Amino acid sequence: MKKAIFLSFSLFLAFNLTAQKKPKINKNKQAIITALDQKYDELTTLSDKVWSFEETAFQEKQSAEALASYAEANGFKVSRGVAGIPTAFVAEYGSGAPIIAIMGEYDALPGLSQKATSFTKDPVNEGGAGQGCGHNLFGTASIGAATAVKELIEAGKLEGTVRFYGTPAEEQFFGKLWMIREGLFDDVDVMMDWHPGDETKANVQSSLALVDFMVEFTGQSAHAAADPWNG
């Protein structure tokens, strides 16, 4: 009896697995995936550069310039120092609607210097800054995606404008607020954002609210979004 049940269950699984259709990817999406695969080495090099600069809020001069220069070299019109912030920039290609924007960050965090080859605390510079939230990946992958979309617009396969926002000081001082006040996002139709994490998925997600006040904590520190229960 057990053998019969096991055989039936196995046949059921086999039928369902073979019956599932392979998801179709449209031509434009496949072109973007192919373009990003071809840019793998140069984007990895760019990400490693930003990681090595270890620049904190509003000090991201080399990081911002590396990303802005990459955009410029790939045909984007780049506006540097927007909203009165030397390390903020906007890169744009195309014309008209829709205006599709992609966010990028690149600031490091103080005190998180860490060698890439170690999973235990092993700073490059004791007490120095480091990429604690993967913003070297954030900025680089976003500009890579924008570049791949730009190539489709250039080839006449898409219409509209693709825009990359280089946003400094996400972790401290909130550079995006100053960019919002300047109206830099007012004409955007769709803004896309992402963040390094332990899952690969697309979703709509809420964020922590911000009220500006001073608090002094004692005890064990923890990340407010990722593991508040450990603090």
Where are these regions (language model features)?
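Bacterial Sec-dependent N-terminal signal peptides
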Residues: M1-P23
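Hydrophobic alpha-helical segments, especially transmembrane helices
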Residues: K3-A4, D48, N136, L177
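General alpha-helical segment detector with a strong preference for membrane-spanning helices
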Residues: F6, L109-G111, F138-T140, E199, ...
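Short, glycine/serine-rich, charged loops/turns that create anion-binding
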Residues: L11, D107, A169
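Short polybasic/polar patches that bind polyanions
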Residues: L13, S52, E72, I180-R181
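A generic alpha-helix preference that emphasizes hydrophobic side chains
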Residues: N16-T18, S47, K176
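Acidic/His- and Gly-rich active-site-bordering loop/insert found
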Residues: K21-Q131, T140-G160
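Histidine/acidic-residue-rich, glycine-tolerant segments that coordinate divalent metal ions
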Residues: T120-G130, N136-L137, I153-G231
